[in-house]
Amino acid sequence: MQVSIACTEHNLKSRNGEDRLLSKQSSTAPNVVNAARAKFRTVAIIARSLGTFTPQHHISLKESTAKQTGMKYRNLGKSGLRVSCLGLGTWVTFGGQISDEVAERLMTIAYESGVNLFDTAEVYAAGKAEVILGSIIKKKGWRRSSLVITTKLYWGGKAETERGLSRKHIIEGLKGSLQRLQLEYVDVVFANRPDSNTPMEEIVRAMTHVINQGMAMYWGTSRWSAMEIMEAYSVARQFNMIPPVCEQAEYHLFQREKVEVQLPELYHKIGVGAMTWSPLACGIISGKYGNGVPESSRASLKCYQWLKERIVSEEGRKQQNKLKDLSPIAERLGCTLPQLAVAWCLRNEGVSSVLLGSSTPEQLIENLGAIQVLPKMTSHVVNEIDNILRNKPYSKKDYRS
């Protein structure tokens, strides 16, 4: 657009010369000359009008803020899809830790706060999370066009053909998800992990097929390496198919390298954005584990023994000490430690959206408050945090320089 305007402005400057040329030709082709002049004037008028609003439009494409809720919206990668910078995830909670009534309350709070992104997966609570999410959307009567619904495929069932990223499971798995969600399509379908048993061309062809069939608008990856994402993009370009637009990756104060080093390079090269999850590191950054593992916490559950071991390990104790050192920064900014952690994730402009996981309305409201903390995340504050964490990743280019 900028190039077109620049060329048009150049044409406007040389308009007198063109008029003289047209006047010389007018004796032989008056109709052609008049048509050319009319077309030129139309282009000039359009160029002037575009010149007045293009800069503002360019800014809004990067980030915009809803006046009523204060929610910020960003593009998902280099696609045109606008997503709220905070989304609501359903892992563990929907169909598991919380009741259907609490799930409805959480979705209502999120929606009324400006959240338009809701993420789920076929494997969450064995499909029940999708059922609950779809039922709430239908009950609330929210306009489908106002929502961005994403789901993930890989673990669909116990049968050998009900998992993986074969063409069969991608198509059948997405059909099953749509039935549970009671939706005609999802906005983004994610490959929930890489599949070494399926050729990349088959995966990309299947994702392109479900998009062409109207079952999804875009497709993305989750837990894929940069090399695997690049391979998918190359295959898509080679065979004129649709490449992925986004990678779902874990990102928090103690997990940084992929989102801060690998994905930015992919974004600039092929336009793949980042949708991140677990901003509180499965609750480790919430502050509840500073004095051990409470009985009512997620880490106390039998199926989360790995989380408990992680917390009580030597590395876990070091992380808790670092969180204590971060608390004064949060107090100075007038926020809680979880709000600081979420705002820290949002300060990364390469992150399109951060998925929140909450089991109570109070937790969700607190985490949504990170939007108000984001303007306070100055370079000085970020440097303070880096000095405490001492885990800032660097690319090979940085080391060479």
From Swiss-Prot:
Keywords: Cell membrane, Cytoplasm, Ion transport, Membrane, NADP, Oxidoreductase, Potassium, Potassium transport, Transport
One GO CC term on file: potassium channel complex
Subcellular location: Cytoplasm; Membrane; Cell membrane
Biological-process GO terms, alphabetical: diaphragm development; heart development; learning or memory; myoblast differentiation; regulation of delayed rectifier potassium channel activity; regulation of potassium ion transmembrane transport; skeletal muscle tissue development
One protein family per Pfam: Aldo_ket_red
Tissues where the protein occurs: Detected in brain. Detected in hippocampus, in the middle third of the molecular layer of the dentate gyrus and in the mossy fiber zone of the CA3 region. Detected in globus pallidus and pars reticulata of the substantia nigra (at protein level). Specifically expressed in the nervous system. Detected in mesenteric arteries.
Catalytic activity from the UniProt record: a primary alcohol + NADP(+) = an aldehyde + NADPH + H(+); a secondary alcohol + NADP(+) = a ketone + NADPH + H(+)
Highest taxon in the source lineage: Eukaryota
Annotated NADP(+) binding sites: 90-91, 97, 119, 192, 222-223, 248, 277-282, 288, 298, 357, 359, 363, 366-367
Gene3D superfamilies noted in UniProt: NADP-dependent oxidoreductase domain
GO MF: aldo-keto reductase (NADPH) activity; carbonyl reductase (NADPH) activity; molecular function inhibitor activity; NADPH binding; potassium channel regulator activity; protein domain specific binding; transmembrane transporter binding; voltage-gated potassium channel activity
Membrane topology designation: Peripheral membrane protein
SUPFAM superfamilies in UniProt: NAD(P)-linked oxidoreductase
Annotated EC: 1.1.1.-
Catalytic center residues: Y124 (proton donor/acceptor)
Chain's role: Regulatory subunit of the voltage-gated potassium (Kv) channels composed of pore-forming and potassium-conducting alpha subunits and of regulatory beta subunits. The beta-1/KCNAB1 cytoplasmic subunit mediates closure of delayed rectifier potassium channels by physically obstructing the pore via its N-terminal domain and increases the speed of channel closure for other family members. Promotes the inactivation of KCNA1, KCNA2, KCNA4, KCNA5 and KCNA6 alpha subunit-containing channels.
Family: Belongs to the shaker potassium channel beta subunit family.
NCBIfam families: Kv_beta
Assembly and oligomerization: Homotetramer. Interaction with tetrameric potassium channel alpha subunits gives rise to a heterooctamer. Identified in potassium channel complexes containing KCNA1, KCNA2, KCNA4, KCNA5, KCNA6, KCNAB1 and KCNAB2. Part of a complex containing KCNA1, KCNA4 and LGI1; interaction with LGI1 inhibits down-regulation of KCNA1 channel activity. Interacts with the dimer formed by GNB1 and GNG2; this enhances KCNA1 binding. Interacts with SQSTM1.
Domain comment quoted from the record: The N-terminal domain of the beta subunit mediates closure of delayed rectifier potassium channels by physically obstructing the pore.
Protein name as annotated: Voltage-gated potassium channel subunit beta-1
Highest classification ranks of the organism: Eukaryota, Metazoa, Chordata, Craniata, Vertebrata
